[in-house]
Amino acid sequence: MTVEVGADENPDFAHDETDGAGDESDDEDAQGRDPELDLAVQYGDEIGDAQRKSLPKRKVIAEWLEPAIFSDTQFTVRFVGADEGRALNHSYRHKDYATNVLTFAYGEEPDGVTVADLVLCCPVVEKEAREQGKTLVAHYAHLLVHGALHAQGYDHERGEEDAAEMEALEIDILAKLGFPNPYR
């Protein structure tokens, strides 16, 4: 789910911590080099130390995102609890429930860098993984890839053709990462 947010509307958590820069992927951009991923990882107040330890680490998140980026990107991934997830979904989408992933796409910077925040609501992700019989790791990988594609303009809500294109990309990227088709 993508939320278009103008620069003056940045949520408080947007890009305040950078945890490294310049990870590389296997895809080359138009300039003949691999797209760069500048990645920050944050945790909401509801995420305790025990839960934080069970979440994917920055290096793993970067490994999952790299095949899903097609140009230089600056992403902040934020793991939140149900209250923050619900508040963000309500504020930006006018839906009064927490959802699995929200993508706050800020567009492309003048230098061509795609900037976005990917917010994952841990309790929702955990519940969905259990209900769908998926591993938690596979579900987090899928939702991060899904959010990254949204940040780059892919949108499954524009129609069946766009949904099919986005799903095919997700399936292909996840297969390259060693994960099963998330739609089965």
UniProtKB/Swiss-Prot annotation:
A Pfam family it matches: YbeY
Sorted UniProt keywords: Cytoplasm, Endonuclease, Hydrolase, Metal-binding, Nuclease, Ribosome biogenesis, rRNA processing, Zinc
Compositionally biased region (Acidic residues): 1-11, 19-29
Species annotation: Burkholderia mallei (strain ATCC 23344)
EC assignment: 3.1.-.-
PROSITE patterns: UPF0054 (PS01306)
A Gene Ontology term for the protein's cellular component: cytoplasm
Top-level EC class: hydrolase
Cofactor(s) essential for the protein: Zn(2+)
InterPro entries for this protein: MetalPrtase_cat_dom_sf_prd, YbeY, YbeY_CS
Cofactor note: Binds 1 zinc ion.
UniProt function note: Single strand-specific metallo-endoribonuclease involved in late-stage 70S ribosome quality control and in maturation of the 3' terminus of the 16S rRNA.
Chief location category: cytoplasm
Gene that specifies this protein: ybeY
Gene Ontology biological process: rRNA processing
Family: Belongs to the endoribonuclease YbeY family.
Region entry Disordered, spans: 1-37
GO MF annotation terms: metalloendopeptidase activity; RNA endonuclease activity; zinc ion binding
Protein location: Cytoplasm
Protein name: Endoribonuclease YbeY
Domain of life assignment: Bacteria
Matching Gene3D superfamilies: Metalloproteases ('zincins'), catalytic domain
Binding residues annotated for Zn(2+), in chain numbering: 146, 150, 156
PANTHER family the UniProt entry points to: ENDORIBONUCLEASE YBEY, CHLOROPLASTIC (PTHR46986:SF1)
